[in-house]
Design a protein with these regions (language model features):
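Hydrophobic alpha-helical transmembrane segments
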Residues: 123-137
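Polar-ligand-bearing catalytic/cofactor-coordination segments
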Residues: 2-103, 144-194
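Long, charge-patterned amphipathic alpha-helical coiled-coil/hairpin "stalk" segments used as oligomerization
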Residues: 90-115, 130-134
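Juxtamembrane "helix exit" motif at the C-terminal ends of alpha-helical transmembrane segments
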Residues: 106-125, 195-197
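Alpha-helical transmembrane segments and their membrane-interface exit regions
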Residues: 138-144
């Protein structure tokens, strides 16, 4: 997957980088006067949680002096800035995600329990096909939500994070930063597509 390739490619330590992702993140939060958001390590997917006011960054990135570390932290801070400014598309995205979680759970349940039961108790290929379509529809809601809200991700990367990074990162590293910001913007969409298959 291209997203993972880019994130790994630029997660190499740069000895000349004056800060880690966490250090730069704290500095940006302070400059943006965002005092109610913390930066925390996590084992899973990098994300900003607007309810908890927490930025979660994978432990293999957070304290590194790498392009991936600083760009991913800046991207997630982009979401914190959106939240601070009450950016309507971010609020809409959160609402949609919460509302579609039920469809994902139904789809998962039907995939694990429903489809095998249908195979066991019916010989009708039509019923099996309808059940498969319903299951795929339920599981695809996540992809649809992230596709619809992709502009929120690109806003966090290129309208919020990129101008900040231009103040701190040497020009010779900006191309790599843009690649990582693009990958960060596409992470949720890529993960949701992979989760279907």
């Amino acid at each position: 997957l291209w997203v993972n390739y880019i994130l790994k490619k630029y997660n190499k330590i740069l000895p000349d980088m004056p800060f880690t992702g966490r250090e730069l993140g704290k500095k940006i939060l302070e400059e943006e006067e965002i005092t109610n958001v913390s930066i925390n390590p996590i084992q899973q997917l990098d994300h900003y949680n607007p309810k908890e006011k927490k930025i979660h960054i994978a432990t293999d990135k957070l304290d590194k002096k790498s392009i991936t570390s600083i760009a991913v932290v800046a991207h997630e801070i982009g979401h914190a800035i959106q939240d601070k400014e009450k950016y309507k598309p971010l609020i809409l995205r959160q609402s949609l995600i919460e509302k579609t979680m039920i469809f994902q759970r139904i789809g998962s349940f039907l995939l694990i329990i429903g489809l095998p039961s249908i195979f066991a108790f019916t010989k009708s290929p039509f019923i099996t096909l309808i059940a498969a379509i319903i299951i795929m529809g339920c599981l695809s809601t996540n992809v649809l939500i992230h596709l619809i809200t992709l502009p929120v991700e690109f806003d966090a990367s290129f309208k919020r994070a990129l101008p900040i990074l231009k103040r701190y990162v040497p020009k010779e590293n900006m191309y790599q930063c843009k690649s990582v910001l693009r990958a960060a913007a596409l992470t949720y969409l890529a993960q949701s597509i992979v989760s279907i298959f």
